[in-house]
């Protein structure tokens, strides 16, 4: 009976100790992440405020352009820039395809956004959604 009591007592003790170390490590990691995020926000904010762009400063890339619609997508190698009829612009992932011709078209900054390929979620598909066709 004494052995059973020792085993149960040890189990509770180990559980409490592991909970203490896990929780302490978890809080420390969370605190470090919060500090890093605050630094990132602070440096972004400082770059945004220190920018002397006389026109429009793109919020995602900090590029200085004439107008909002001239902003590039933040990841142009993997995104298409789709222009909506209301003047807004959205960036979507380029469709995944193994067809070299389509890859070349989607990589072209002029032809890619104008492409409308059946079965692909490209800018043509986005316009269909915008128009309520899908």
From Swiss-Prot:
CDD domains: LCL2-like (cd23996). Residues 1-19 form the signal peptide. InterPro entries: LCL2. Keywords: Signal. GO terms for biological process: ERAD pathway. PANTHER family: LONG CHRONOLOGICAL LIFESPAN PROTEIN 2. Belongs to the LCL2 family. Probable component of the endoplasmic reticulum-associated degradation (ERAD) pathway. This is Long chronological lifespan protein 2.
């Amino acid at each position: 009976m004494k052995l059973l009591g020792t085993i149960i007592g040890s189990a509770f003790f180990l559980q409490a100790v592991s909970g203490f170390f896990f929780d302490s490590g978890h809080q420390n990691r969370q605190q470090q992440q919060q500090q890093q995020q605050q630094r990132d926000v602070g440096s972004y904010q400082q770059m945004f405020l220190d920018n002397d762009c006389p026109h429009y400063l793109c919020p995602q890339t900090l590029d200085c352009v004439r107008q909002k619609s001239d902003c590039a997508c933040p990841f142009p190698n993997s995104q298409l820039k789709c222009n909506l009829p209301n003047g807004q612009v959205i960036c979507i992932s380029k469709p995944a395809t193994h067809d070299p011709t389509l890859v070349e078209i989607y990589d072209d900054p002029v032809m890619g956004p104008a492409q409308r390929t059946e079965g692909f979620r490209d800018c043509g598909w986005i316009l269909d959604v915008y128009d309520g066709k899908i």
